[in-house]
C-alpha cells in the first residue's frame, strides 16, 4: 500500500442510492443520518472517495471528508467504527464498502 497525499477518487456528486440522495445536495451531505441503516448507506458512498490499496494520512482524510460535511471528525470515526476504513498510527485505508469494477 502506498501513502497518498492528494485527494481521492472523486465520487459522483449525485449518489445512485435514493436513500443517500435524500442526505446529499450539490455533492455535500446536508445531514449525517441518525438511523444506523441509513448512515451505513451514506458511509458506503463516502468510502468510495478512497482508493482501495492506498494509505492516507489523517490530515488528507480530514480534508477529503471536509468537502462533504463540516463534521469530518464524526464521519472519519463512523467510517472506522463501521468497518469502511481502518486506522493505525494516524494513517487510514479503505477496508470495506462497495467497489465499482
PLM region descriptions:
Residues 52-65:
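Short acidic, hydrophobic short linear motifs in intrinsically disordered regions
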Residues 81-92:
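A short, conserved structural fragment
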Amino acid at each position: 500500500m502506498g501513502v497518498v497525499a492528494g485527494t481521492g477518487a472523486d465520487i459522483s456528486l449525485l449518489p445512485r442510492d435514493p436513500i443517500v440522495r435524500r442526505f446529499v445536495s450539490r455533492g455535500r451531505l446536508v445531514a449525517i443520518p441518525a438511523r444506523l441503516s441509513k448512515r451505513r448507506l451514506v458511509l458506503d458512498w463516502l468510502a468510495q472517495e478512497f482508493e482501495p490499496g492506498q494509505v492516507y494520512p489523517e490530515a488528507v482524510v480530514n480534508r477529503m471528508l471536509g468537502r462533504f460535511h463540516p463534521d469530518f471528525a464524526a464521519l472519519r470515526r463512523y467510517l472506522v467504527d463501521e468497518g469502511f476504513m481502518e486506522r493505525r498510527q494516524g494513517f487510514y485505508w479503505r477496508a470495506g464498502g462497495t467497489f465499482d469494477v
